[in-house]
Amino acid sequence: MRNNHIVIMAGGVGSRFWPLSTPEYPKQFIDILGCGRTLIQLTVDRFKGICPMSNFWVVTNAAYVDIVKRQLPDIPAEHILAEPAARNTAPCIAWACWSIKKEDANANVVVTPADAVVMNPEEFRRVIGNALAFTDNNNAIVTIGIKPSRPETGYGYVETSLTPNPSPKGEGNEILAVSSFKEKPDHETAEKYLKAGNYLWNAGIFVWNIDTITNCITKYKPLIAEQMDKIVNDLPSDSTCYTLNSKLEEVFPQCEKISIDFAVMEPASKDAIVYTHPADFGWSDLGNWASLHDKLSKDADNNGAVGNVKLFECNNCVVHAEDAKKVVLQGLDGYIVSEKNGQILVCKRSEEQRIREFSAE
């Protein structure tokens, strides 16, 4: 446990949840479920018992550092990594892993987004524990694959072998070899994936030991590795690699803007070192209002609401009005209603893909 580290990626802006989520205060820092905890706090909660608080790391936008400190006061301030520029997930993860390796050469690491929802944290911890045991004993990358319940077109997929991995050291009987990664499919292809039985949703949660990931980045993206050496390893002994400094501000924005999936996962899967742990712990990436409606408790008319909300003759609505003193709605069918800081959205659920357009007006 003392060598386990958790990296939380918390730099996104969550523009599909406007007006709840804004560039100044995005969804990972909001109590979007109305449970008294923000999404990033829930993320930390579900990892408790897997590693000490001193081994948590957060990579975020420089503008959000103070929010992270307020919401997660037990995480060491030097473990809050402030990106000077958004360069997608590969440089973000590389920076965190190079920083961890400098502190703990025997680290075993879990990387997770800050804004996912897990309804069964006990099962989540069991799955993560299995994956950590596997990567502790193997030169392997494990991605958590969610067992699909529907032909979802909004997620990427992981194609797996149909039998457990052939030669694990230590625990790993539930872990399968990954054949390939698939981009978000159309509905017909998603139907085929569901019927095939060997495709899982890619949850964007990764587990590896520190040598495996740093070696992979060095092999597949050597320039990013060189840049991380400059940022983390080439600093003078009295400096810090965690806060904004001249070396970081100079080098990090030069990193290739690329996801960890394209930078590492796809080439590593061709080298047969990528595995997946199938899981069913009530996961959602909470990427849109439809997914929030799915996770909220519903009344008899299929309405989900957060806040002091009164509904009359309403059906199939999702309402979030935590800041408002009281919201009363009548006669709506299939609407999103949201209020935050004096801004109000009323939108048909069938038109939610236009919310970014509306918020830009």
Would you name each region that the model predicts?
Residues 9-10, 59, 110-113, 143-147, ...:
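Short beta-strand segments
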Residues 2-4, 53-54, 76-77, 104-107, ...:
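Short coil/turn connectors at secondary-structure junctions
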